């Protein structure tokens, strides 16, 4: 069953009309302003680099995953969360809370999602709205809500309530993925979810695409290997390319009946694809799957181009490299052997490559990445892009050692503001995981 409220007809700040049953469980609090942390710099850090701690106190704070679309395009405001790890927060945790960080106001943190069960926020491309989900599901039962709120916290509205099978299917979605993705025109939003009934091992996962103007949802892809999809809309403003979504397929994964991942990949590992948001034009990215090169599972589009970047691990030569590629027609799950697939090693000029998590800016000019040795706190490096498909990354420079333990819950996960002037990262250097930012590099 679906309940639609066309949000253009809903009165401004009617927040109580469609609030989750658990919505009042969170007691919202304002955060503090950012704190200078020049003590994190070392002798090799560039002159003029400034470091700030954005969250403070005994309660953990973290950035959303680096591919999440959580910034306003003017680079002035973005989302982060408290009582969270580098990979998300607990949906039944009353302390887990999302904030808007206002960088023009000294990093002031203002609560933006008051309901418990809030997950997967995305900021609209025009910076006006935050879309998010309230997940009240369990495998085979429950409901979820797609909501919208103004970036200033006003005008909260329910776009769509889903409390039955997805249209045209027998699947009920549950365990919504912690990251959603929104199209460059702000008209469509996608998220993956578990589709199992809670009784069957290795059940399907699927990709849902929401039409934000019509308040409808469509299942465009499903299967048992889509457990960790990392779906990312192209940032291109081209009418056709704007419908492309980058997705990850985890071959050899093992899933229990509840949808929990018991084994992430097997055999030759994951591969990366591109699909149109109507479920057509399924393509390959030319990475991994040859027995030597393996996709780490971190990838993103290169600015607004049709090139994308992934981090790989190879057996020979031993390393973790950054490879950009361009999609080619699907020819089986053959990865880098895909006929017509274009590749470019962005790290070929370096003596060693130990890269993992990375991101670029909105225009595809600037780049930031973490790098090993991760058992010594890790490193954060910045670089500049050249011509897509031809040049290696250049202008490499070391920024700092974030002094993180680099455990899964405290991964550094660096990313850039849309304008490329600020870099953001996580660290538990204080003994508690917190969110940080840098500028002046």
Predicted regions and their residues:
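N-terminal export signals
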Residues: 6-27
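Blade/loop signatures of beta-propeller domains
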Residues: 28-51
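Beta-strand-rich domains and repeat architectures in extracellular enzymes and scaffolds
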Residues: 55-89
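Blade-terminus and WD-like Trp-Asp/Gly-His loop motifs, strongest in beta-propeller folds
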Residues: 69-77, 121-129, 180-188, 232-246, ...
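Short, conserved, GDST-rich strand-edge loop motifs in beta-rich repeat architectures
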Residues: 83-93, 135-141, 191-203, 248-268, ...
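Asp-box/WD-like beta-propeller blade repeats and closely related beta-sheet repeat scaffolds
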Residues: 116-124, 128, 132-196
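Loop/turn-rich, solvent-exposed surfaces of beta-rich toroidal or solenoidal domains
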Residues: 311-315, 330, 348-389
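Conserved blade-ending motifs and adjacent loop-strand segments that build the rim/top face
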Residues: 347-357, 392-413
């Amino acid at each position: 069953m679906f309940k639609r409220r066309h949000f253009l007809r809903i009165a401004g700040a009617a927040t109580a009309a469609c609030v989750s049953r658990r919505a009042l469980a969170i007691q919202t609090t304002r955060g503090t302003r950012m704190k200078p942390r020049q003590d994190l710099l070392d002798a090799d850090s560039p002159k003029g680099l400034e470091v700030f701690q954005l969250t403070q106190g005994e309660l953990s704070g973290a950035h959303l995953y680096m591919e999440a679309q959580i910034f306003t395009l003017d680079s002035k405001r973005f989302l982060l969360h408290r009582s969270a790890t580098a990979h998300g927060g607990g949906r039944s945790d009353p302390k887990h809370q999302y904030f808007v960080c206002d960088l023009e106001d000294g990093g002031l943190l203002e609560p933006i999602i008051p309901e418990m069960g809030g997950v997967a926020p995305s900021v609209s491309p025009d910076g006006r709205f935050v879309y998010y989900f309230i997940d009240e599901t369990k495998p085979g039962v429950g409901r979820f809500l797609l909501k919208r709120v103004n970036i200033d916290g006003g005008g909260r509205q329910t776009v769509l309530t889903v409390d039955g099978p997805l249209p045209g299917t027998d699947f009920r979605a549950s365990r919504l993925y912690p990251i959603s993705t929104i199209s460059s025109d702000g008209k469509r939003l996608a998220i993956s979810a578990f589709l199992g009934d809670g009784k069957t091992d290795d059940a399907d996962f699927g990709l849902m695409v929401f039409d934000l103007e019509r308040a409808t949802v469509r299942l465009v892809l499903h299967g048992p290997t889509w457990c960790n999809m990392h779906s990312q809309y192209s940032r291109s403003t081209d009418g056709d390319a704007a419908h492309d979504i980058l997705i990850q397929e985890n071959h050899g994964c093992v899933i229990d009946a509840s949808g929990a991942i018991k084994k992430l990949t097997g055999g030759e590992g994951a591969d990366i694809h591109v699909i149109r948001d109507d479920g057509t034009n399924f393509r390959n990215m030319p990475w991994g799957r040859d027995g030597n090169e393996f996709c780490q599972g971190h990838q993103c589009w290169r600015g607004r181009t049709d090139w994308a970047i992934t981090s790989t691990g190879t057996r020979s030569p031993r390393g973790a490299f950054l490879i950009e590629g361009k999609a080619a027609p699907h020819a089986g799950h053959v990865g880098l052997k895909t006929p017509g697939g274009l590749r470019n090693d962005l790290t070929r000029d370096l003596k060693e490559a130990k890269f993992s998590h990375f991101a670029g800016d909105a225009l595809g000019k600037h780049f930031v990445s973490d790098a090993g040795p991760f058992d010594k706190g890790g490193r954060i490096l910045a670089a500049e892009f050249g011509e897509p498909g031809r040049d290696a990354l250049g202008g490499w420079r070391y920024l700092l050692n974030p002094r993180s333990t680099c455990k899964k819950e405290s991964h550094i996960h660096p990313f850039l503001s849309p304008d490329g002037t600020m870099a953001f990262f996580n660290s538990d250097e204080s003994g508690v995981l917190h969110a940080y930012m840098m500028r002046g590099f």
